[in-house]
Amino acid sequence: MAISTLKTGRIAIIGASGYGGLQLVKLINEHPDFEISTLNGERSVGKNWNEINPFMKILGDKKITKSNIDEIALDSDYAILSLPNGLSSQLTPLLLKKGVKVLDLSADYRFKSLDKWKEVYTKEAAKYKRYDYDLCEEAIYGFSEEFSSEISKSRLIACPGCYPTASLSLLIPFLKQGLIESEGIIIDAKSGTSGGGRNPSEQLLLSECSESIRPYGVIGHRHTAEIESIASHFAGHQVNLQFTPHLVPMVRGILSTVYARLRDPGLTAEDCKIVIEAFYKDQPFIDILPVGTYPATKWVKNTNKVMISVEVDKRNGRIVLMSVIDNLLKGQAGQAIQNLNIMHGLESDIGLPKITFYP
């Protein structure tokens, strides 16, 4: 019996030359149900993909083109936008009008209020004029494990940021069930250098970041507002928390450690582990580790997994939650494909890696 090779979803990747775009190309090229219809990238217009990326050759090769909405609409069912903040909002309304469903990797539609986005992304708001209040309200936040029903019916997905994905995966089960105090939450997170993108940057030079770790964006990091927005949704009231990111000398990976006060100080680490296991039951990308086993970024490298561990400090009634993700996969392109699978009526884990190469 012949095996069907028909691919049913045509995907345009807009912004294919950055790290996020590279992951998308690899994942879609190897996906059993999707094919790459269009590759857009301002840096390499007119060049063949396989010519400039000999380490990631794709079947049939593709010429990188400028974004043309009419051409994308003719060739594509979905567009995944891996663009700088602000720029996505200039293309998304046009794509949606042409009937192309959009998954946006930027922060442009992560807030239900456009005014809130303008408050957080002030430089981008000054550069790009936006009036798409209705689309901000319509967009579904692409935290796949919690919003899959809404994602399946949506035409516009706002894919979460990398730090929010790692941190919210810990907070949501406990805020939604009222098991932790919403005041005094602290998030300490560490990310590899690929989180800074592919453009040259002095602070990401090997001689600058090797053998060194440093905090950045200590007060007012943009992901603070995103985390607070979603955390408040699940808590049912405003959540104000402390979030501090750190740059560590590795290429990919995020470790997020969350500290919060338990409402019931009698809960044990085993009790809290059961809470997380029940909340994420049957979710293929969430792994809950045994109490006393703490996650390492290498364990999820090159996968779409989230690994979670929990401890309880009986001295002060605090819960300590830990998660690791690959910032370029579960924190970016992998979660986008997970959402794309859901939108297309597939199992969420189709075509996504679950097991790392180790060491």
From Swiss-Prot:
EC number(s) stated in the UniProt entry for this protein: 1.2.1.38
Any one GO MF annotation of this record: NADP+ binding
PROSITE patterns given in the database record: ARGC (PS01224)
Annotated Gene Ontology cellular component terms: cytoplasm
Signal peptide positions on this chain: none
Pathway entry: Amino-acid biosynthesis; L-arginine biosynthesis; N(2)-acetyl-L-ornithine from L-glutamate: step 3/4
BP-aspect Gene Ontology terms: L-arginine biosynthetic process
A UniProt-annotated Pfam family: Semialdhyde_dhC_1
Domain of life (superkingdom): Bacteria
Matching Gene3D superfamilies: Dihydrodipicolinate Reductase, domain 2, NAD(P)-binding Rossmann-like Domain
Keyword tags: Amino-acid biosynthesis, Arginine biosynthesis, Cytoplasm, NADP, Oxidoreductase
Chief location category: cytoplasm
Residues at the catalytic site: 162
InterPro entries named in the record: AGPR_AS (IPR023013), AGPR_type-1 (IPR000706), NAD(P)-bd_dom_sf (IPR036291), NAGSA_dehydrogenase (IPR050085), Semialdehyde_DH_NAD-bd (IPR000534)
Coiled coil, from the record: none
Known catalytic reactions: N-acetyl-L-glutamate 5-semialdehyde + phosphate + NADP(+) = N-acetyl-L-glutamyl 5-phosphate + NADPH + H(+)
Keyword Cytoplasm in annotation: yes
Top-level enzyme category: oxidoreductase
Protein family (similarity comment): Belongs to the NAGSA dehydrogenase family. Type 1 subfamily.
Function summary: Catalyzes the NADPH-dependent reduction of N-acetyl-5-glutamyl phosphate to yield N-acetyl-L-glutamate 5-semialdehyde.
HAMAP family: ArgC_type1 (MF_00150)
Protein name: N-acetyl-gamma-glutamyl-phosphate reductase
Organism, scientific name: Prochlorococcus marinus (strain NATL2A)
